[in-house]
Amino acid sequence: MNWDGLYASAFERIRDNIGKVGNVLLAYNTNIDAIKYLEREDLERRIGAAGREEVLPYSEKLPKRIESVPQLLGSILWSIRRGKAAELFVESCSTRFYMRRWGWDELRMGGQVGIMANLLGGVYGVPVIAHVPQLSRLQAELFKDGPIYVPKVEGGKLKLVHPKEFKADEENCIHYIYEFPRGFRVFDFEAPRENRFIGSADDYNTNVVIRPEFEEHFGEIAEKTELAIISGLQALTEGNYREPFETIKEHLDVLEGKGIPAHLEFAFTPDETVRKEILGVLGKFWSVGLNEVELASIMDVMGEKTLAEKLLAHDPVDPIVVTKAMLKLAEKTGVRRIHFHTYGYYLALTDYRGEFVRDALLFAALAAAAKAKLGDVRNIDDVVKAMDVPVNEKAKGVEEALTKEYGMENGIAEVNGYQLAFIPTKIVAKPKSTVGIGDTISSSAFVGEFALR
Protein backbone atom coordinates (compact mmCIF):
# COMPACT_ATOMS: atom_id res chain seq x y z
CA MET A 1 0.00 0.00 0.00
CA ASN A 2 1.08 3.57 -0.67
CA TRP A 3 0.82 4.79 2.92
CA ASP A 4 2.84 7.95 2.20
CA GLY A 5 0.26 8.95 -0.41
CA LEU A 6 -2.56 8.38 2.09
CA TYR A 7 -0.65 10.41 4.70
CA ALA A 8 -0.24 13.36 2.32
CA SER A 9 -3.89 13.27 1.24
CA ALA A 10 -5.18 13.05 4.83
CA PHE A 11 -3.04 16.00 5.93
CA GLU A 12 -4.25 18.21 3.10
CA ARG A 13 -7.92 17.38 3.68
CA ILE A 14 -7.78 18.06 7.41
CA ARG A 15 -5.67 21.22 7.03
CA ASP A 16 -8.27 22.55 4.59
CA ASN A 17 -11.23 21.68 6.84
CA ILE A 18 -10.07 22.06 10.44
CA GLY A 19 -11.27 25.67 10.48
CA LYS A 20 -14.86 24.33 10.47
CA VAL A 21 -14.48 22.90 13.99
CA GLY A 22 -16.08 25.03 16.71
CA ASN A 23 -15.21 25.40 20.40
CA VAL A 24 -13.67 22.32 22.01
CA LEU A 25 -14.11 22.03 25.78
CA LEU A 26 -11.04 20.59 27.55
CA ALA A 27 -11.21 19.40 31.17
CA TYR A 28 -9.78 18.82 33.79
CA ASN A 29 -5.99 18.62 34.21
CA THR A 30 -3.45 21.36 33.49
CA ASN A 31 -0.06 21.70 35.15
CA ILE A 32 3.60 22.63 34.72
CA ASP A 33 5.96 19.85 33.59
CA ALA A 34 9.47 19.94 35.05
CA ILE A 35 11.42 17.70 32.66
CA LYS A 36 14.58 15.87 33.71
CA TYR A 37 16.59 13.96 31.10
CA LEU A 38 17.98 10.96 32.98
CA GLU A 39 21.71 10.23 33.11
CA ARG A 40 22.96 6.72 33.87
CA GLU A 41 25.66 7.57 36.42
CA ASP A 42 23.41 9.97 38.31
CA LEU A 43 20.52 7.49 38.48
CA GLU A 44 22.73 4.55 39.52
CA ARG A 45 24.31 6.71 42.25
CA ARG A 46 20.89 7.73 43.54
CA ILE A 47 19.64 4.13 43.57
CA GLY A 48 22.77 3.08 45.44
CA ALA A 49 22.28 5.83 48.01
CA ALA A 50 18.61 4.90 48.51
CA GLY A 51 19.47 1.18 48.81
CA ARG A 52 19.33 -0.98 45.72
CA GLU A 53 17.52 -3.79 47.56
CA GLU A 54 14.87 -1.26 48.64
CA VAL A 55 14.44 0.12 45.11
CA LEU A 56 14.37 -2.97 42.85
CA PRO A 57 11.07 -4.52 44.06
CA TYR A 58 9.23 -1.44 42.73
CA SER A 59 10.79 -1.99 39.30
CA GLU A 60 8.88 -5.31 39.24
CA LYS A 61 5.53 -4.00 40.45
CA LEU A 62 4.50 -0.37 40.69
CA PRO A 63 3.19 0.98 44.00
CA LYS A 64 -0.25 2.60 44.00
CA ARG A 65 1.34 5.93 44.92
CA ILE A 66 4.80 7.17 45.87
CA GLU A 67 5.48 7.50 49.58
CA SER A 68 9.29 7.21 49.61
CA VAL A 69 12.41 7.85 47.52
CA PRO A 70 12.98 4.09 46.87
CA GLN A 71 9.44 3.90 45.45
CA LEU A 72 10.16 6.89 43.19
CA LEU A 73 13.43 5.43 41.87
CA GLY A 74 11.94 1.93 41.51
CA SER A 75 8.99 3.32 39.54
CA ILE A 76 11.38 5.13 37.20
CA LEU A 77 13.18 1.78 36.71
CA TRP A 78 9.83 0.08 36.00
CA SER A 79 9.30 2.45 33.06
CA ILE A 80 12.88 2.09 31.81
CA ARG A 81 12.81 -1.73 31.88
CA ARG A 82 9.63 -1.86 29.79
CA GLY A 83 9.98 1.31 27.73
CA LYS A 84 6.48 2.19 28.94
CA ALA A 85 5.09 5.38 30.44
CA ALA A 86 3.59 5.48 33.92
CA GLU A 87 2.34 8.24 36.19
CA LEU A 88 1.94 8.10 39.97
CA PHE A 89 0.93 10.60 42.64
CA VAL A 90 3.76 11.61 44.99
CA GLU A 91 2.17 11.77 48.43
CA SER A 92 5.29 12.15 50.57
CA CYS A 93 6.46 15.73 51.24
CA SER A 94 10.04 14.56 51.76
CA THR A 95 9.99 12.83 48.34
CA ARG A 96 8.60 15.99 46.72
CA PHE A 97 11.47 17.92 48.30
CA TYR A 98 13.93 15.30 46.97
CA MET A 99 12.52 15.75 43.45
CA ARG A 100 12.74 19.53 43.69
CA ARG A 101 16.40 19.29 44.78
CA TRP A 102 17.10 16.80 41.97
CA GLY A 103 15.95 19.59 39.67
CA TRP A 104 14.92 19.78 36.03
CA ASP A 105 16.34 20.62 32.63
CA GLU A 106 13.34 22.55 31.30
CA LEU A 107 9.81 23.66 32.18
CA ARG A 108 6.94 23.06 29.75
CA MET A 109 3.19 23.12 29.55
CA GLY A 110 1.86 19.97 31.19
CA GLY A 111 -1.35 18.12 31.86
CA GLN A 112 -3.47 16.67 29.11
CA VAL A 113 -5.70 19.76 28.96
CA GLY A 114 -2.76 22.17 28.81
CA ILE A 115 -0.97 20.21 26.10
CA MET A 116 -4.12 19.76 24.00
CA ALA A 117 -5.07 23.44 24.42
CA ASN A 118 -1.71 24.55 23.04
CA LEU A 119 -1.98 22.08 20.15
CA LEU A 120 -5.61 22.63 19.15
CA GLY A 121 -5.77 26.36 19.85
CA GLY A 122 -2.16 27.45 19.49
CA VAL A 123 -1.19 25.30 16.49
CA TYR A 124 -4.37 24.31 14.62
CA GLY A 125 -6.35 27.47 15.37
CA VAL A 126 -9.30 25.47 16.76
CA PRO A 127 -10.93 27.49 19.59
CA VAL A 128 -10.74 25.76 22.98
CA ILE A 129 -12.19 26.39 26.43
CA ALA A 130 -9.77 24.99 29.02
CA HIS A 131 -10.14 24.03 32.66
CA VAL A 132 -7.01 25.13 34.56
CA PRO A 133 -7.16 24.16 38.27
CA GLN A 134 -4.63 26.82 39.30
CA LEU A 135 -3.73 29.76 37.07
CA SER A 136 -0.36 30.94 38.33
CA ARG A 137 1.62 33.52 36.34
CA LEU A 138 4.03 30.82 35.16
CA GLN A 139 1.15 28.52 34.15
CA ALA A 140 -0.50 31.33 32.16
CA GLU A 141 2.76 32.18 30.36
CA LEU A 142 3.08 28.57 29.15
CA PHE A 143 -0.08 28.89 27.04
CA LYS A 144 0.50 29.71 23.37
CA ASP A 145 -1.17 32.66 21.71
CA GLY A 146 -4.32 31.86 19.73
CA PRO A 147 -7.99 31.05 20.44
CA ILE A 148 -7.36 29.52 23.88
CA TYR A 149 -9.86 30.59 26.53
CA VAL A 150 -10.62 30.11 30.21
CA PRO A 151 -13.93 31.09 31.83
CA LYS A 152 -13.85 34.15 34.09
CA VAL A 153 -16.77 35.46 36.12
CA GLU A 154 -17.05 39.21 36.71
CA GLY A 155 -20.10 40.77 38.28
CA GLY A 156 -21.88 37.43 38.11
CA LYS A 157 -21.40 37.24 34.33
CA LEU A 158 -19.33 34.64 32.51
CA LYS A 159 -16.83 35.68 29.88
CA LEU A 160 -14.03 33.85 28.07
CA VAL A 161 -10.49 35.26 28.22
CA HIS A 162 -7.03 34.05 27.23
CA PRO A 163 -5.19 32.60 30.28
CA LYS A 164 -2.65 35.45 30.11
CA GLU A 165 -5.54 37.91 30.56
CA PHE A 166 -7.01 36.03 33.54
CA LYS A 167 -4.49 37.83 35.77
CA ALA A 168 -4.52 35.56 38.81
CA ASP A 169 -1.54 34.49 40.88
CA GLU A 170 -2.60 31.07 42.05
CA GLU A 171 -0.36 28.11 42.92
CA ASN A 172 2.14 26.36 40.65
CA CYS A 173 1.10 22.73 40.03
CA ILE A 174 4.32 20.89 39.14
CA HIS A 175 4.70 17.38 37.73
CA TYR A 176 8.18 15.88 37.42
CA ILE A 177 8.91 14.08 34.15
CA TYR A 178 11.88 11.68 34.01
CA GLU A 179 12.70 11.07 30.33
CA PHE A 180 14.98 8.39 28.88
CA PRO A 181 15.98 7.52 25.29
CA ARG A 182 15.79 4.14 23.58
CA GLY A 183 18.79 2.03 24.65
CA PHE A 184 19.18 3.91 27.95
CA ARG A 185 21.07 1.61 30.33
CA VAL A 186 21.02 1.51 34.10
CA PHE A 187 22.68 -1.45 35.83
CA ASP A 188 21.68 -4.49 33.72
CA PHE A 189 18.49 -2.93 32.38
CA GLU A 190 18.09 -1.39 28.93
CA ALA A 191 15.13 0.64 27.70
CA PRO A 192 13.57 -1.04 24.62
CA ARG A 193 12.24 2.37 23.55
CA GLU A 194 12.17 5.98 24.63
CA ASN A 195 9.58 7.00 27.21
CA ARG A 196 9.18 8.64 30.61
CA PHE A 197 7.97 8.28 34.18
CA ILE A 198 5.81 11.03 35.69
CA GLY A 199 5.71 11.90 39.38
CA SER A 200 2.65 14.10 40.04
CA ALA A 201 3.42 16.45 42.92
CA ASP A 202 0.40 18.71 43.16
CA ASP A 203 -2.81 18.37 45.14
CA TYR A 204 -5.20 20.00 42.66
CA ASN A 205 -4.95 17.81 39.55
CA THR A 206 -4.54 14.65 41.59
CA ASN A 207 -7.79 15.32 43.46
CA VAL A 208 -9.50 16.70 40.31
CA VAL A 209 -10.30 19.97 42.05
CA ILE A 210 -12.86 21.67 39.80
CA ARG A 211 -12.87 25.45 39.53
CA PRO A 212 -15.95 27.35 40.76
CA GLU A 213 -16.48 28.78 37.25
CA PHE A 214 -17.02 25.19 36.02
CA GLU A 215 -19.06 24.20 39.07
CA GLU A 216 -21.46 27.14 38.85
CA HIS A 217 -21.60 27.98 35.13
CA PHE A 218 -21.09 24.66 33.36
CA GLY A 219 -24.39 24.80 31.48
CA GLU A 220 -23.45 28.20 30.07
CA ILE A 221 -19.96 26.94 29.13
CA ALA A 222 -21.47 23.88 27.42
CA GLU A 223 -23.75 26.17 25.35
CA LYS A 224 -20.60 27.56 23.73
CA THR A 225 -19.17 24.08 23.02
CA GLU A 226 -19.27 21.74 19.99
CA LEU A 227 -16.92 18.97 21.17
CA ALA A 228 -15.44 17.95 24.52
CA ILE A 229 -12.33 16.08 25.61
CA ILE A 230 -12.20 14.86 29.21
CA SER A 231 -8.98 13.78 30.92
CA GLY A 232 -7.18 13.79 34.25
CA LEU A 233 -9.09 11.11 36.17
CA GLN A 234 -6.06 8.81 36.48
CA ALA A 235 -4.73 10.03 39.85
CA LEU A 236 -8.02 9.60 41.72
CA THR A 237 -8.18 6.93 44.41
CA GLU A 238 -10.83 5.01 46.33
CA GLY A 239 -10.43 7.62 49.06
CA ASN A 240 -11.00 10.79 47.03
CA TYR A 241 -12.94 9.96 43.85
CA ARG A 242 -16.54 10.33 45.06
CA GLU A 243 -16.90 14.12 45.20
CA PRO A 244 -15.24 14.94 41.84
CA PHE A 245 -17.06 12.02 40.18
CA GLU A 246 -20.43 13.48 41.19
CA THR A 247 -19.56 16.74 39.43
CA ILE A 248 -18.06 14.94 36.43
CA LYS A 249 -21.24 12.85 36.02
CA GLU A 250 -23.32 16.05 36.13
CA HIS A 251 -21.08 17.58 33.45
CA LEU A 252 -21.40 14.45 31.29
CA ASP A 253 -25.19 14.55 31.64
CA VAL A 254 -25.20 18.19 30.45
CA LEU A 255 -22.96 17.36 27.46
CA GLU A 256 -25.05 14.29 26.61
CA GLY A 257 -28.27 16.29 26.91
CA LYS A 258 -26.97 18.88 24.46
CA GLY A 259 -25.73 16.20 22.03
CA ILE A 260 -22.08 17.24 22.40
CA PRO A 261 -19.71 14.36 21.50
CA ALA A 262 -17.24 13.81 24.35
CA HIS A 263 -13.95 11.91 24.18
CA LEU A 264 -12.33 10.39 27.27
CA GLU A 265 -8.55 10.39 27.13
CA PHE A 266 -7.74 7.47 29.40
CA ALA A 267 -4.41 7.28 31.20
CA PHE A 268 -2.69 4.75 33.45
CA THR A 269 -5.01 4.54 36.48
CA PRO A 270 -3.51 2.50 39.34
CA ASP A 271 -6.64 2.41 41.53
CA GLU A 272 -8.96 -0.48 40.63
CA THR A 273 -12.03 1.14 42.19
CA VAL A 274 -11.54 4.25 40.05
CA ARG A 275 -11.06 2.13 36.92
CA LYS A 276 -14.40 0.45 37.65
CA GLU A 277 -16.06 3.85 38.10
CA ILE A 278 -14.62 5.08 34.80
CA LEU A 279 -15.87 1.90 33.11
CA GLY A 280 -19.31 2.62 34.58
CA VAL A 281 -19.57 6.08 32.96
CA LEU A 282 -17.92 5.19 29.64
CA GLY A 283 -21.31 4.80 27.98
CA LYS A 284 -21.85 8.57 28.36
CA PHE A 285 -18.86 9.19 26.08
CA TRP A 286 -18.79 9.14 22.28
CA SER A 287 -15.16 8.06 22.25
CA VAL A 288 -12.25 6.79 24.37
CA GLY A 289 -8.50 6.75 23.66
CA LEU A 290 -6.01 4.37 25.26
CA ASN A 291 -2.83 2.30 24.82
CA GLU A 292 -2.13 -1.38 25.56
CA VAL A 293 -1.30 -0.87 29.26
CA GLU A 294 -4.50 1.12 29.76
CA LEU A 295 -6.64 -1.29 27.73
CA ALA A 296 -5.22 -4.23 29.72
CA SER A 297 -6.07 -2.47 32.99
CA ILE A 298 -9.70 -2.05 31.82
CA MET A 299 -9.89 -5.70 30.71
CA ASP A 300 -8.64 -6.63 34.17
CA VAL A 301 -11.55 -4.90 35.96
CA MET A 302 -13.97 -6.40 33.41
CA GLY A 303 -12.79 -9.84 34.55
CA GLU A 304 -11.00 -10.55 31.24
CA LYS A 305 -7.73 -11.58 32.94
CA THR A 306 -6.44 -13.76 30.09
CA LEU A 307 -7.08 -11.04 27.53
CA ALA A 308 -5.35 -8.50 29.79
CA GLU A 309 -2.26 -10.71 29.99
CA LYS A 310 -2.19 -11.28 26.22
CA LEU A 311 -2.28 -7.52 25.59
CA LEU A 312 1.05 -7.16 27.38
CA ALA A 313 2.65 -10.40 26.15
CA HIS A 314 4.04 -9.30 22.78
CA ASP A 315 5.88 -6.35 21.26
CA PRO A 316 4.39 -5.07 19.05
CA VAL A 317 1.12 -5.89 20.76
CA ASP A 318 -0.98 -8.47 18.88
CA PRO A 319 -3.61 -6.51 16.85
CA ILE A 320 -6.08 -9.42 16.92
CA VAL A 321 -5.97 -9.46 20.72
CA VAL A 322 -6.39 -5.67 20.75
CA THR A 323 -9.42 -5.91 18.43
CA LYS A 324 -11.03 -8.58 20.63
CA ALA A 325 -10.50 -6.38 23.69
CA MET A 326 -11.93 -3.31 21.94
CA LEU A 327 -14.99 -5.30 20.84
CA LYS A 328 -15.62 -6.43 24.42
CA LEU A 329 -15.29 -2.85 25.67
CA ALA A 330 -17.59 -1.45 22.96
CA GLU A 331 -20.23 -4.14 23.52
CA LYS A 332 -20.18 -3.68 27.30
CA THR A 333 -20.30 0.12 27.39
CA GLY A 334 -21.87 1.25 24.11
CA VAL A 335 -19.05 3.73 23.49
CA ARG A 336 -19.18 4.58 19.76
CA ARG A 337 -15.47 4.95 19.07
CA ILE A 338 -12.37 3.34 20.60
CA HIS A 339 -9.02 4.75 19.52
CA PHE A 340 -6.11 2.45 20.36
CA HIS A 341 -2.60 3.85 20.03
CA THR A 342 0.63 1.94 20.54
CA TYR A 343 4.21 2.27 19.38
CA GLY A 344 4.10 1.53 15.66
CA TYR A 345 0.38 1.49 14.79
CA TYR A 346 -3.09 2.81 15.65
CA LEU A 347 -6.52 1.19 15.46
CA ALA A 348 -9.99 2.73 15.66
CA LEU A 349 -13.13 0.67 16.25
CA THR A 350 -16.29 2.64 15.40
CA ASP A 351 -20.01 1.91 15.12
CA TYR A 352 -20.02 4.20 12.07
CA ARG A 353 -18.18 3.89 8.78
CA GLY A 354 -16.02 5.98 6.48
CA GLU A 355 -12.46 6.51 5.32
CA PHE A 356 -12.41 9.76 7.32
CA VAL A 357 -11.82 7.67 10.47
CA ARG A 358 -8.61 6.23 8.98
CA ASP A 359 -7.59 9.62 7.58
CA ALA A 360 -7.96 11.27 10.99
CA LEU A 361 -5.63 8.60 12.42
CA LEU A 362 -3.10 9.36 9.66
CA PHE A 363 -3.23 13.09 10.45
CA ALA A 364 -2.75 12.31 14.15
CA ALA A 365 0.25 10.08 13.45
CA LEU A 366 1.83 12.78 11.29
CA ALA A 367 1.27 15.38 14.03
CA ALA A 368 2.83 13.04 16.62
CA ALA A 369 5.85 12.43 14.38
CA ALA A 370 6.24 16.19 13.86
CA LYS A 371 6.17 16.79 17.62
CA ALA A 372 8.74 14.03 18.19
CA LYS A 373 10.97 15.32 15.38
CA LEU A 374 10.75 19.07 16.05
CA GLY A 375 10.10 19.11 19.81
CA ASP A 376 7.54 21.88 19.34
CA VAL A 377 5.03 22.27 16.51
CA ARG A 378 4.50 25.99 15.87
CA ASN A 379 1.71 25.89 13.28
CA ILE A 380 -0.27 23.35 11.28
CA ASP A 381 2.14 23.59 8.34
CA ASP A 382 4.92 22.28 10.63
CA VAL A 383 3.02 18.97 10.73
CA VAL A 384 3.89 18.23 7.09
CA LYS A 385 7.60 18.40 7.99
CA ALA A 386 7.23 14.85 9.31
CA MET A 387 6.37 13.46 5.85
CA ASP A 388 10.02 12.43 5.41
CA VAL A 389 9.90 10.33 8.59
CA PRO A 390 9.70 6.66 7.50
CA VAL A 391 6.57 4.57 8.03
CA ASN A 392 7.13 1.84 10.63
CA GLU A 393 8.34 -1.28 8.76
CA LYS A 394 7.39 -3.59 11.65
CA ALA A 395 3.74 -2.65 11.15
CA LYS A 396 3.67 -4.73 7.94
CA GLY A 397 3.23 -7.84 10.07
CA VAL A 398 0.37 -6.15 11.92
CA GLU A 399 -1.32 -5.24 8.63
CA GLU A 400 -0.88 -8.79 7.30
CA ALA A 401 -2.42 -10.26 10.46
CA LEU A 402 -5.43 -7.94 10.19
CA THR A 403 -5.84 -8.71 6.48
CA LYS A 404 -5.72 -12.46 7.14
CA GLU A 405 -8.13 -12.33 10.10
CA TYR A 406 -10.61 -9.68 8.95
CA GLY A 407 -10.02 -9.19 5.22
CA MET A 408 -8.77 -5.65 5.75
CA GLU A 409 -8.38 -3.47 2.62
CA ASN A 410 -6.78 -0.02 2.50
CA GLY A 411 -6.62 -0.02 6.29
CA ILE A 412 -10.36 -0.68 6.77
CA ALA A 413 -12.29 -3.84 7.72
CA GLU A 414 -15.74 -4.86 8.92
CA VAL A 415 -15.67 -6.71 12.27
CA ASN A 416 -18.76 -7.91 14.16
CA GLY A 417 -20.89 -4.97 13.02
CA TYR A 418 -18.17 -2.38 13.63
CA GLN A 419 -15.65 -0.71 11.33
CA LEU A 420 -12.00 -1.31 12.21
CA ALA A 421 -9.49 1.23 10.85
CA PHE A 422 -5.71 0.65 10.93
CA ILE A 423 -2.67 2.77 10.15
CA PRO A 424 1.08 2.22 10.54
CA THR A 425 2.74 5.17 12.28
CA LYS A 426 5.89 7.09 11.42
CA ILE A 427 8.76 6.39 13.82
CA VAL A 428 11.24 9.16 14.70
CA ALA A 429 14.55 7.42 15.50
CA LYS A 430 15.73 10.05 18.00
CA PRO A 431 12.75 12.04 19.27
CA LYS A 432 13.41 15.37 20.95
CA SER A 433 10.74 14.54 23.54
CA THR A 434 8.00 12.00 24.25
CA VAL A 435 5.95 14.21 26.59
CA GLY A 436 2.52 14.99 25.17
CA ILE A 437 2.77 12.59 22.23
CA GLY A 438 -0.27 10.58 23.36
CA ASP A 439 -2.32 13.75 23.88
CA THR A 440 -1.27 14.98 20.43
CA ILE A 441 -2.38 11.69 18.88
CA SER A 442 -5.78 11.48 20.55
CA SER A 443 -6.86 15.12 20.24
CA SER A 444 -5.68 15.34 16.61
CA ALA A 445 -7.56 12.17 15.65
CA PHE A 446 -10.78 13.10 17.47
CA VAL A 447 -10.94 16.68 16.21
CA GLY A 448 -9.65 15.57 12.78
CA GLU A 449 -12.63 13.24 12.39
CA PHE A 450 -15.09 16.05 12.98
CA ALA A 451 -13.19 18.32 10.57
CA LEU A 452 -13.88 15.74 7.84
CA ARG A 453 -17.55 15.12 8.62
Curated annotation (Swiss-Prot):
GO terms for molecular function: ADP-specific glucokinase activity; glucokinase activity; magnesium ion binding. Pathway: Glycan degradation; chitin degradation; Carbohydrate degradation; glycolysis. Disruption phenotype: Disruption of the gene severely affects growth in chitin-containing media and leads to an almost complete loss of chitin-dependent hydrogen production. The active site is at D439 (proton acceptor). GO terms for cellular component: cytoplasm. The keyword Oxidoreductase does not apply. Mg(2+) binds at E265, E294, D439. Pfam families: ADP_PFK_GK. InterPro entries: ADP_PFK/GK (IPR007666), ADP_PFK/GK_arc (IPR015990), GlkA (IPR031299), Ribokinase-like (IPR029056). The keyword Transferase applies. It comes from the Archaea. Its EC number is 2.7.1.-, 2.7.1.147. Residues 1-453 form the ADPK domain. It catalyses: D-glucose + ADP = D-glucose 6-phosphate + AMP + H(+); D-glucosamine + ADP = D-glucosamine 6-phosphate + AMP + H(+). Its cofactor is Mg(2+). ADP binds at N291, H341, T342, V428, G438. This is ADP-dependent glucose/glucosamine kinase. The gene is glkA.
